[in-house]
Design a protein with these regions (language model features):
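A conserved beta-strand-loop-helix scaffold within acyl/acetyltransferase catalytic domains
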Residues: 31-50, 55-66, 70-73
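A short beta-loop-alpha structural element at the N-terminal edge
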Residues: 2-16
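A generic "binding-loop/recognition-motif" signal
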Residues: 12, 65, 108-109
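C-terminal "cap" of GNAT-fold acetyltransferases
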Residues: 126-153
Length: 153
């Protein structure tokens, strides 16, 4: 089995959107349009298994201090290979290289992120611009049932 992590190009967006569609439809991941993904393509890391896109995530920078793991997804048939863990670890490494101080995650998978060293925080600690830029677009807003977690770099 050949596993490859790489930075995508805009040509990968269609396949990435196909992969995340089910999670977007059920409200576990926020919809990102093709243009939004193209605009932030440098923030994504993709993993391929035997030449097929198996998962991806993005490290979105909110400020000189705070970044966020976004849109973490691994295809069901590739789960159990620790690809999600490796994608988040890639975000952590990138955050350190960029000199950031903290990585935020809004998640339904508390145990997964705790195992990677993230700590739960109260949602009122999330910067207001994050709420108005992203959360307001969520189908669950304003009754967010995600767990806010941070990793100190």
């Amino acid at each position: 089995m050949e596993i490859e992590f790489f930075k995508p190009t805009v040509e990968h967006i269609g396949k990435m959107q196909e992969l995340v569609k089910e999670e977007v439809d059920n409200g576990t991941i926020l919809l990102r349009t093709e243009d939004e993904m193209a605009n932030t393509i440098r923030s994504y890391t993709v993993v391929k298994v035997d030449g097929k896109i198996a998962g991806f995530t993005a490290l979105h920078i909110h400020s000189a201090r705070l970044s966020e793991v976004r849109s973490l997804v691994v295809a069901k048939n590739f789960r159990g290979l620790k690809l999600g863990k490796k994608l988040v670890e890639a975000c952590i490494e990138e955050g350190i290289k960029l000199g950031l101080k903290q990585i935020l995650s809004l998640t339904y998978q508390k145990g997964f992120f705790e195992a990677l060293g993230f700590d739960e925080i109260e949602k009122d600690q999330i910067p207001e611009h994050k709420i108005w830029a992203d959360c307001i677009r969520c189908k669950h807003f304003p009754k967010c049932d995600e767990i806010a977690m941070v990793y100190d770099l």
